[in-house]
Amino acid sequence: MDLQSLASSIPQDTLLVILAYALLGGLYLLVVPLALFFWMNSRWTRMGKIERLLVYGLVFLFFPGMVVFAPFLNFRLSGQGDN
């Protein structure tokens, strides 16, 4: 059974639901956490109180995706540690 016949045997509504879940899952686990990582890296020393509170809330909300990328991304502040 090839992929074409398998896809045609599944109802279209089911395929749309699977696509929606994949899209939302990718957004939740990949896109937003990466954007949040880079936003925090670029704004860390210039954030105001409200922005920092919002960012901490987003980190809490998107924590599973942040954990996925945490071992691979390391944004240390410049000038700290051994060079």
Curated annotation (Swiss-Prot):
The gene is ndhL. This is NAD(P)H-quinone oxidoreductase subunit L. It is found in: Cellular thylakoid membrane. The chain crosses the membrane at residues 18-38, 53-73. GO terms for molecular function: oxidoreductase activity, acting on NAD(P)H, quinone or similar compound as acceptor; quinone binding. Belongs to the complex I NdhL subunit family. It comes from Parasynechococcus marenigrum (strain WH8102). NDH-1 shuttles electrons from an unknown electron donor, via FMN and iron-sulfur (Fe-S) centers, to quinones in the respiratory and/or the photosynthetic chain. The immediate electron acceptor for the enzyme in this species is believed to be plastoquinone. Couples the redox reaction to proton translocation, and thus conserves the redox energy in a proton gradient. Cyanobacterial NDH-1 also plays a role in inorganic carbon-concentration. NDH-1 can be composed of about 15 different subunits; different subcomplexes with different compositions have been identified which probably have different functions. It is an enzyme of class 7 (translocase). It catalyses: a plastoquinone + NADH + (n+1) H(+)(in) = a plastoquinol + NAD(+) + n H(+)(out); a plastoquinone + NADPH + (n+1) H(+)(in) = a plastoquinol + NADP(+) + n H(+)(out). Its EC number is 7.1.1.-.
